[in-house]
Amino acid sequence: MDERGIKMGWAIGGICKPMVELLQKGKVGKVIDVQDFDLDAVNSINQTPGHFEMSASQYANPANKGAFVNKLDFVVLAALEIDTDFNVNVLTGSDGVLRGAPGGHPDTAAGSKCCIIVTPLIRGRMATVCEKVVTVTTPGDCVDVLVTDYGIAVNPRRPDLIECLDKAGIPHVSIESLKEKAYSIVGRPDEVQFEDQVVAVLEARDGTLLDVVRKIKPYTFDD
């Protein structure tokens, strides 16, 4: 940002110290947050001009046409898993067990002009880039770019971004090749076995059914 004189107009989301520091250094014009992740962010709301609080409805309510997520140019998000259709899972682990909550992940992905997922290719012995995610939290039609430590992949639905990367000389590969690279390192995982019982339902932003989480079957070892 210093080298190219880049300044962000504003930033939203869960805020922590690094974003507060960017605001205080003049690299970000305004910070509007719906939750804080550390005390530096909490204190900044009271002490730093240009740091504002907003409600969850102002942040990402699908029925609110003025929601801030709909005004984002870019959003950078993480993932537990991402598959070759660019579907993202941030809810369940590779073992099918609930790990947390989606938060604003699907909202910011859908509302922004460009959604960038940043994640390592593998975690330990698990492939982050895979054939099919355990649970769809954010659908692939809302995800534009995947950035890993082994390469960048662009959703084929965004030929405009592919053209931009080509013009900038930024190399990129297919997401299928990243999946195969991950499997070549850690192996292809066995599918998680589930029972019929549904323990959680995932709704899309429009209220339609996106996916379900089922009770996992107890793991058994082969004799």
Regions found by a protein language model. Give the residues of each.
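N-terminal active-site beta-alpha-beta segment that forms phosphate/nucleotide-binding
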Residues: 1-45
